[in-house]
Design a protein with these regions (language model features):
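N-terminal Lys/Arg-rich, disordered targeting/topogenic segments
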Residues: 1-18
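Short juxtamembrane and helix-loop transition motifs at transmembrane-helix boundaries
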Residues: 10-14, 28-33, 48-52
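Structural motif marking the loop-to-transmembrane transition
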Residues: 15-19, 23, 139
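Hydrophobic membrane-insertion alpha-helices, especially the h-region
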Residues: 21-39
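Catalytic glycan-binding domains that act on GlcNAc-containing polysaccharides
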Residues: 37-198
Length: 198
């Protein structure tokens, strides 16, 4: 009887040991998943050296801030050249094919393969420059137009009486566009601060 009781206790302890190991494994898996999620956050993303050079060259050519250009790419695609949105925007800068075609006609830049960063980034940089000129260097309006389209931004300016100096991102009616502008400007500020520290 005593031997059977001891055996039973050992089995209980063994079972508890297995439960502890299972809980530890589960906790470890959750922590690993959380670490992957945190590290995949856009604030930790960095472009490859090749993409960094392409960003610098395109920004210089179009006379725009490299930090702004990188921040748009970061927000749009997290540097994924194969990114395709649910509405059909393609590549790192998430250009719609018809917009890319128009940019190509206006700029003379190729727009044959939008998944190629060497085509996509120069087209997007040209477009940002164009929008900044259209909106008198107002980055908020230019970024809103990049995301929601010029027609929408022009209509908002008319409907809400926005002027060239518009600065209240919270007034942007489309939630997606509002968050896009906030994300790009925050990333741009962070990138500029990092650059200043170097």
């Amino acid at each position: 009887m005593r031997t059977a009781l001891k055996r039973k206790k050992r089995e209980v302890h063994r079972h508890q040991g297995n439960t502890g190991a299972m809980l530890f494994t589960l906790l470890l898996a959750i922590l690993c998943g959380l670490a992957v999620y945190i590290l995949s956050d856009i604030s930790f993303m960095r472009p490859s050296r090749e993409i960094s050079l392409l960003i610098a060259e395109s920004a210089k050519k179009e006379e725009i801030s490299p930090a702004l250009l990188e921040a748009v790419i970061l927000t749009e695609s997290k540097f994924d050249k194969k990114a395709v949105s649910h509405v059909g925007a393609i590549g790192m800068m998430q250009l719609m094919p018809d917009t890319a075609e128009w940019i190509s006609e206006e700029s003379g830049l190729p727009a044959n393969r939008l998944e190629r960063p060497e085509e996509n980034i120069p087209l997007g940089a040209w477009y940002i420059n164009y929008l900044l000129k259209e909106y008198h260097n107002n980055e908020i309006l230019a970024l809103a137009a990049y995301n929601a389209g010029r027609g929408n931004v022009d209509q908002w300016m008319k409907d809400y009486g926005w002027k060239e100096g518009f600065s209240d991102m919270n007034q942007i009616p489309f939630p997606e566009t509002r968050e896009f502008v906030k994300s790009v400007t925050a990333s741009r500020d962070r990138l500029e601060a990092e650059q200043a520290e170097k």
